[in-house]
Amino acid sequence: MLEAVEIIEVSPRDGIQNEKKLLSLDSKLELIDRAVKAGASRIEVTSFVNPKKVPQMAQADEICAALPRDTNCQYIGLALNRRGFERACNAGLDEVNFVAVASDTFCQKNQGMDTDSGLKLFNDCLLYTSPSPRD
């Protein structure tokens, strides 16, 4: 029997990444604020990707710098490569998520590498991380 279910709000990242009209920084922060006020305890706020490929994620660093820290909410960023991982680690987030892709074709299209390279990168980044919590 399942003892608990954890819901992660992903609309500030996944919900807007394919939108044609670019959202302002204020609009993105308002979306996050509304999720916090609605009771979300974990929010994937952005993705640290190339803004030329995903223009909606161009303000990842600015979003993280403006997040309210007086909440019980955990903020999460998505990283697809080492540069994104390093940016996410420096952004003051509570957590960095990775994507593990089963298909080489999709992994190449989404992350610019094959699945084995993606898993190796994930492992390398795990070795880099520290178990100490954010101050």
List each language-model region with its residue ranges:
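Hydrophobic faces of well-ordered beta-strands that scaffold small-molecule active sites
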Residues: 6-10, 43-45, 75-77, 96-98
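Active-site beta-loop-alpha junctions enriched in small/polar residues
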Residues: 13, 48, 78-83, 101, ...
